[in-house]
């Protein structure tokens, strides 16, 4: 019989170090069957060769930075902005858009434009948070075969990790363009309160983008690095991070280059997106009350309202009121309908007051876990776009009894901190040590569905702990070890992050076999678990079944897909550049034709104009996404028209040269004139 329960026999006080095989409970990487792998925590003494970029993969926007010597620098994208919208879209022509271009077309393509997908990463489809999101977004969230929440656009499904991978690919391309060479190594940030599945899924996104993710750093910790890089004084700092989709509060102690996290807390489903949704609901309900029309099922209308709500939210951080004007939002038998309403800051603050209040308890818990009073906090750092909202700032002041610091950019601090950690790993930044913590308690299920903790939350990582358990039934030869993360006393209320079977236990009365379970948490916060039957002290047959995520083959397919897109993106870029060159050539030729039309053979002119028309039609096809026309085809057509134009204008050039020579022969130097 296989029991899903253990009896906890740690009463004896025994503590052992596991010598059995270590198995990564990496649900998000290994899907329905996870493979065994040895794991060791790197000491960090070996330095990485080549540049290491820091990426803040945000819910609404992402940011990229790198160390230039001892100074972190934010790298602007191709559009010239220092942050990139975390938006991915698929057009009817099969083109994939990322960033600014994807966000611009969202209002006309809402069903196939993905935003805020970070809120879904590493989550199960049936989780309450996912079910709430399904009602609020215009795109389809579907259940994958492994139970995860995936996305669907134009008949194809994508994992949230894959969408994150597309965004990371964009960031990698930006960095490679800036540095003039391919970039492989990166430090990527995650919300401090992300669980193991979400961290694994983020690393998978990096793999899909072709990146070697050297370290996963908690966002508040990264912001503290950005704040404290040049600070010499010891300090205890609170980082209040309210971004687009998540909220974190971390308390750190800065001491002579050592950044030690004392505690962390938060809410992985609280951020600017929720503030937008609150305002969208208000606008839709007000319109329904005034006009008798329900817009909630009209995806196009809701997307327009969402964009207007986001804009109004930002404006109300600096204005006391703003107008929302959306003409022709819908129509009925009486004609077109429009939205015209004024929103005041006070009105908006009342709408989102419950959301702002949700940040208070995590802050109190973080202070309690750190064993600190508010008076002992030396500085409060604000991170994330929502911390620009006056009501949020006032709430922070009321919690910590002090004015927040203004020295860091809320949108860029996390990426800068990631770049600093990259500098540490590459050896460019010295005398800096980062000690982070695990955000949630870790343990296993024991008899009666009890959650038995092995590692408590806010334990400094990397860490390792072992504990001895036994069987719950006589003659039991196998046990199922179920690993959970959370703070509740029963496993049913916590997050299952993995499970595996230990077989080959020698039959014995219940309570006699000694089964040692060891937990390892590495510097990324990734969890490894091993189990060993101490009585037999031999290799056991262990099958590990993951709770969710991507299989190795799925990741490999997505990496190949990303590479394919990367190649097509480069081909597309080259085609556009050749199209621009072709248009420039055509314009120059037409200009010369107009200037010299009286001196040219008319048949030759007609042939040349025909070639110009043909070339422009080809350019139009390329711009419309015709992949049948290669870059070489374009170059050949440009060369042909240039050669033809040279022949057409040859007589003009000859006449000009002859005229110049004759005028030169007829003119003598001033001194030679008689």
UniProtKB/Swiss-Prot annotation:
One of its GO terms (molecular function) is ATP binding. PROSITE patterns: HSP70_1, HSP70_2, HSP70_3. It catalyses: ATP + H2O = ADP + phosphate + H(+). It holds the Pfam family HSP70. The keyword tRNA-binding does not apply. GO terms for biological process: [2Fe-2S] cluster assembly; chaperone cofactor-dependent protein refolding; iron-sulfur cluster assembly; protein import into mitochondrial matrix; protein refolding. Residues 655-666 have a biased composition (Polar residues). Its EC number is 3.6.4.10. It is found in: Mitochondrion matrix. The keyword Mitochondrion applies. GO terms for cellular component: cytoplasm; mitochondrion; PAM complex, Tim23 associated import motor. Keywords: ATP-binding, Hydrolase, Mitochondrion, Nucleotide-binding, Stress response, Transit peptide. It is an enzyme of class 3 (hydrolase). Residues 655-674 are annotated as: Disordered. Residues 1-43 form a transit peptide. Required for the assembly of iron-sulfur (Fe/S) clusters in mitochondria. Assisted by the DnaJ-like co-chaperone jac1 and the nucleotide exchange factor mge1, it mediates ATP-dependent Fe-S cluster transfer from the scaffold proteins isu1/isu2 to grx5. Essential component of the PAM complex, a complex required for the translocation of transit peptide-containing proteins from the inner membrane into the mitochondrial matrix in an ATP-dependent manner. Constitutes the ATP-driven core of the motor and binds the precursor preprotein. Interacts with the Fe/S cluster transfer protein GRX5. Interacts with the Fe/S cluster assembly proteins ISU1 and JAC1. Component of the PAM complex. Belongs to the heat shock protein 70 family. PANTHER family: HEAT SHOCK PROTEIN 70KDA. This is Iron-sulfur cluster biogenesis chaperone, mitochondrial. It comes from Schizosaccharomyces pombe (strain 972 / ATCC 24843) (Fission yeast).
